[in-house]
């Protein structure tokens, strides 16, 4: 009886960091028992995906991944939260308020390194401004975390203290979404919102043993801290 009860309860398949690899995603869904019907991957009975963010950048199938994820959400077969790459994309494409007489800039600098990290997404939407705005609009709907009756989900680190700091500035309820003001604050180095989002979406960082120690990440960037 207890086994039958468990089988009838909602179960979740947790999928993170797709990074533009639609073929890998569909292969995984197929292995998990999901089937396509009318262009949407549908879940087995009492199952649902929770996507943990980082849908974009790196891989060659940016639009395809977003199409799969959004279709599953719209039909009730998936939930999704924000990753640091979606947060970075919003900041990259959101103009900052400029002082009179100074040039406009963005919440995330358009530096060489930032452009390189975002290159595949930029290329995918280089001649599709409508599609770009639709993608950004989708990112704005993504909560920073889920706190459901039987499961919690966050992209990197579940940190109650930082979540508490963000609660007054994000959309209330069970879905904690950034509005424009909180996006601006979270993109401003040194603010409580900045530090909170860094931890929730990237994880807690600790310095290496000494200043002399460092390593190169997969993007070739020198790092002196680890998560």
Question: Positions of the model-derived regions?
Answer:
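Polar low-complexity intrinsically disordered regions
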Residues: 1-9, 137, 181, 222-225
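N-terminal active-site segment of His-dependent metallophosphoesterases
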Residues: 1-67
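Intrinsically disordered, low-complexity N-terminal regions enriched in serine/proline/glycine
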Residues: 11, 33, 54, 124, ...
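Active-site neighborhood of divalent metal-dependent phosphoester bond hydrolases
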Residues: 45-46, 59-66, 71-202
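Low-complexity, serine/threonine/proline-enriched polar segments
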Residues: 187-227
């Amino acid at each position: 009886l207890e086994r039958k009860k468990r089988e009838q309860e909602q179960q979740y398949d947790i999928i993170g960091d797709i990074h533009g690899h639609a073929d890998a995603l569909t292969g995984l869904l197929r292995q998990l028992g999901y089937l396509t019907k009318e262009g949407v991957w549908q879940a087995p009975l009492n199952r649902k995906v929770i996507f943990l963010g980082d849908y974009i950048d790196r891989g060659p199938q940016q639009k395809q991944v977003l199409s799969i994820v959004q279709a599953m959400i719209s039909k009730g077969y998936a939930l999704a939260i924000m990753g640091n790459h979606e947060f970075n994309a919003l900041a990259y494409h959101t103009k900052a308020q400029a002082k009179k007489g100074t040039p406009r800039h963005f919440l995330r600098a358009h530096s060489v390194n930032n452009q390189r990290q975002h290159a595949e997404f930029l290329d995918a939407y280089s001649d599709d401004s409508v599609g770009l705005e639709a993608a950004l609009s989708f990112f704005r709907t993504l909560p920073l975390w889920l706190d459901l009756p039987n499961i919690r989900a966050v992209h990197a680190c579940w940190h109650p203290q930082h979540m508490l700091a963000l609660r007054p500035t994000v959309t209330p309820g069970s879905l904690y979404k950034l509005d424009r003001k909180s996006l601006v604050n979270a993109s401003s180095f040194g603010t409580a919102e900045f530090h909170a989002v860094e931890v929730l979406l990237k994880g807690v960082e600790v310095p290496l043993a000494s200043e002399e120690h460092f390593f190169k990440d997969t993007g070739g960037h020198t790092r002196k801290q680890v998560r």
